[in-house]
Design a protein with these regions (language model features):
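Periplasmic/extracellular electron-transfer cofactor-ligation site
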Residues: 45-68, 130-139, 428-445, 618-619, ...
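Long, His/Glu/Asp-enriched segments that create or flank divalent metal/ion-associated functional microenvironments
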Residues: 654-678, 682-716
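Primarily short, surface-exposed interaction patches in extracytoplasmic proteins
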Residues: 235-306, 311, 317-664, 703-704, ...
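Solvent-exposed helix-loop boundary motif
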Residues: 21-122, 139-166, 174-237, 267, ...
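Bacterial N-terminal signal peptides
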Residues: 8-16
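Bacterial N-terminal signal peptides that target proteins for export
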Residues: 1-8
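Catalytic cores of secreted or luminal carbohydrate-active enzymes
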Residues: 115-135, 712-719, 723, 727-728
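Sequence/structural segment immediately N-terminal to covalent heme-attachment motifs in c-type
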Residues: 35-52, 120-128, 417-433, 564, ...
Length: 799
């Protein structure tokens, strides 16, 4: 029996279509044939009809469902022409099509009016319906997109320029599809872009222009040169400057002059070791006539023990050193978090090649090829050391690999590991691809689940799947620990530490791609399959691919993180978001840094030295008329907030005190905040870390660490008892200055040098002297002066 639905579908296909006409496009061309995939689906995507918040949601909207982001043309064609008894299109009377009536507001539509009846968009839909609402499968398969201009769109101030997008399709034909694209610009203060790709300049600078067309993405930079005379440039110190200056020439931006010696000294000391230079160091550096003094300073700071601690802290963020996720009880987790930090610190201190460090994380096991008895003895020794020192100074950093990376209180699904590894070592965010291909990125569900399945053999458990010899050795050690705990009057539960193993298991866990309901073959991102053979650890092949010189992400991701640390903003920003829609602000510089890094054998210290000794790093934060709007081309130093750990250490450095770590947070005397590995602290310092944005390290996203200024940060410096106590410390800076035999002028100068790393200006000196001389006591004068200085914006920011 013929159903009404089938009859309606047959009528759509059989009845003679309405009269048709060419469509005049807003970019000046004429569209003579409307194609469902190329044009109709392009406009559905551009209008947002197939997004997750509209008809692309799993449930659809008001009975009408499209495929998410238009990835399934067959489904969408059926939804438009067959569902709802075919009422959405009317080939005999196209204007009566529900598709058009809702879009123009003639019929109630939750999405509101999407376009007007007189618009070219209406004409495209109308002509498609009038032509029989046909679909040619595969007609819109995209081979590539080409953009004119292909790299930089230079637009003079207050002028406009049209961007042209050409699609080459799988059948070999090409077409100008500019009006069917969606255009997004990263900074509307620099330029704006209209719906059909016309870019209008607003102020000097550059912005990223992202162009989307039915799942394909291309991007370019919009350049708005500064007006006026041609920019001038100093002699480059190295290749970094040459490539930065090349970009600035396009922008006609003259870089700022060099920072003063005092500013440079403060900047680089905070960046490299999270400390302030002493007053004596500031005076000596400013007076030193040696033309190589900055070079010598950088070399000294890069070799400083605290420099390794700074990068161990950053790498703890990157690798997910989350104390809460480690084995409990809490004191055990904190100790192991510290050991994790110290393992990373030793590798930075020893300048181990970065690719080796990453391989030693990705392929980590507990045994490291040792006999089970050796492993048990090492584990016992480390645990005993950790119990005495709260995790500091153990032998764990001498372990060849970082098995703590894989040790978690709760079992981790394979997809959690893939997201962590991609974000940490490739700068790639995969989360969206778990459910669908994001319209601004390349990764599909098959990419996501295939990459996840590489981690199907890594195991951390109570040795039930371990080799017999390992199981026996661990069982004996655990029994001995239990006996010792009970003999000491402790309960035999978490009071003793179970010996557990991270290893490559014969038990393979493989996840299905929910889109196909089939197991996705393990493979590297966008690359070859990883075959599970015998007892081979698939992570070895993963590590080889990740650290390969040909990997398009590995070296770039790390040099970008280094650049972002020293400049406050990455060449790709956010630093863990390398994607098609987020191109670098200076691609040639990023490529050159990565190439140099690879050729150096992944020498991190050499990379840092290159960056720190560039003229670019040494520029002043003070701007000129041509670069005052610059936010991402490094024509001047950017004023930037400190990391939370730097805030604590810089405050202590200025106030001449050490942080007090006690109880579960206990640390050796004199320990700096950047030397502490635990992400979960309990003392007074925990509040300061939280309000200044230290991350809990619970997700694989750099966005966890916040650098945004907030009122609690200001109130903390102004009123918190912790600051008051440090100001009043008997051996602290205030007491030292108050007791010293200094004139009023000398007191003011020393206070400025100790906090702002410079001498006061004439106005600052006069104002300070007035307050000092009005105070009732020398101690009161000194306390008020130092308190005022640490509450300045200049103090809490790096510039």
């Amino acid at each position: 029996m013929t159903t009404p639905r089938l009859l309606a579908a047959a009528l759509v296909c059989a009845l003679a279509p309405a009269a048709r006409a060419d469509v005049t496009l807003p970019t000046g061309g004429t569209l003579r044939h409307v194609d469902f995939e190329r044009h109709v689906m392009g406009l559905l995507s551009k209008a947002g009809c197939n997004t997750g918040g509209c008809h692309g949601s799993f449930q659809g909207k008001n009975g009408f469902r499209l495929s998410l982001f238009g990835y399934e043309p067959a489904m969408d064609h059926a939804a438009l022409t067959r569902d709802n008894l075919g009422r959405r299109v009317n080939v005999l009377q196209p204007h009566d099509s529900l598709l058009l009536q809702k879009a123009v507001g003639s019929v109630a539509h939750d999405g509101g009016m999407r376009f007007g009846r007189d618009s070219w968009v209406y004409a495209v839909f109308r002509e498609w319906v009038a032509g029989g609402a046909r679909w040619t499968p595969g007609s819109g398969a995209i081979a590539k997109l080409t953009v004119t201009p292909d790299n930089f769109a230079v637009v003079a101030a207050d002028q406009s320029r049209q961007v042209k997008v050409t699609a080459t399709f799988a059948d070999g034909t090409s077409e100008d599809i500019t009006p069917f694209c969606d255009f997004k610009i990263s900074d509307e203060a620099i330029a704006s872009v209209d719906a059909v790709g016309r870019v209008t300049a607003r102020q000097p600078g550059d912005a990223g222009l992202t162009i989307l067309y039915r799942g394909a993405v291309v991007a370019l930079r919009v350049i708005v040169p500064a007006p006026g005379a041609p920019a001038t440039f100093p002699q480059p110190a190295n290749f970094v400057d040459g490539l930065v200056f090349d970009k600035l020439r396009l922008l006609n931006m003259t870089p700022s002059g060099p920072a003063s010696d005092e500013v440079f000294l403060r900047r680089v000391t905070i960046d490299t070791i999270a400390q302030l230079p002493t007053a004596a160091e500031v005076k000596a550096f400013a007076a030193d006539p040696d033309p190589r003094k900055r070079e010598k300073l950088v070399d000294k700071l890069l070799a400083h023990p605290l420099h390794a601690a700074v990068w161990a802290t950053k790498l703890s963020d990157i690798t997910g050193n989350n104390t809460t996720a480690l084995e409990q009880p809490q004191n055990t987790a904190q100790r192991r978090s510290q050991m994790w930090h110290d393992w990373l610190r030793k590798r930075v201190q020893d300048n181990v090649a970065y690719d080796k460090t990453v391989r030693d994380i990705l392929t980590a096991t507990s045994l490291d090829g040792r006999a089970p008895e050796e492993w048990v003895a090492f584990t016992r020794r480390v645990d005993e050391q950790a119990e005495k020192t709260n995790g500091y100074g153990t032998d764990y950093p001498n372990k060849p690999t970082l098995d703590l990376f894989w040790r978690r209180q709760q079992a981790q699904p394979v997809e959690a590991w893939s997201e962590k590894v991609a974000a940490a070592f490739l700068g790639v965010r995969l989360e969206c691809a778990q459910c669908h291909k994001h319209p601004t990125d390349r990764w599909t569900q098959e990419d996501y689940w295939g990459f996840a399945n590489i981690f199907g053999t890594v195991t951390f458990a109570n040795n039930q799947y371990s080799a017999p010899a390992v199981k026996d050795a661990a069982a004996k050690e655990n029994a001995d620990r239990k006996t010792a705990a009970e003999a000491g009057g402790k309960k035999a539960n978490n009071q003793f530490l179970l010996v557990k193993e991270v290893f490559n298991s014969a038990q393979v866990k493989q996840a299905k791609n929910p889109g196909t309901n089939k197991i996705a073959p393990a493979r590297v991102l966008g690359g070859e399959r990883v075959v599970f053979v015998g007892g081979d650890d698939p992570r070895v092949k993963l590590a080889e691919w990740v650290t390969s010189p040909t990997n398009p992400f590995f070296a770039k991701s790390f040099v970008n993180r280094v650049w972002a640390h020293y400049f406050g903003v990455g060449l790709v920003n956010p630093v863990d978001d390398f994607s098609l829609a987020n191109p670098p602000t200076n691609a040639k510089l990023l490529d050159a840094l990565a190439d140099s890094f690879v050729k150096s054998g992944y020498d991190v210290r050499k990379l840092e030295r290159t960056v720190l000794l560039s003229r670019t790093y040494g520029l002043s934060f003070q701007t000129n008329d041509s670069n005052k709007f610059d936010k991402n081309n490094f024509s001047h130093s950017y004023i930037r907030p400190l990391l939370a750990e730097q805030v604590v250490d810089v405050l202590n450095s200025a106030l001449g005190v050490d942080e007090q770590f006690a109880g579960q947070d206990a640390a050796p005397a004199g320990t700096k905040m950047v030397e502490v590995g635990s992400s979960r602290l309990n003392g007074n310092v925990a509040y300061a870390l939280r309000i200044f944005g230290r991350p809990p390290r619970t997700t694989a996203c750099d966005c966890e660490r916040s650098a945004e200024p907030a009122l609690p940060q200001t109130l903390f410096r102004m009123t918190d008892p912790t600051i008051s106590n440090k100001l009043a410390a008997g051996t602290g800076r205030v007491q030292q200055l108050a007791k010293a035999k200094l004139s009023d002028e000398e007191l003011v100068e020393e206070a400025f040098l100790a906090t702002l790393s410079r001498r006061p200006t004439a106005d600052e000196k006069a104002s300070s002297l007035t307050h000092v001389r009005a105070a009732r006591t020398r101690l009161e004068a000194t306390t008020d002066l130092v308190w005022a200085l640490i509450n300045t914006r200049e103090f809490i920011l790096n510039h």
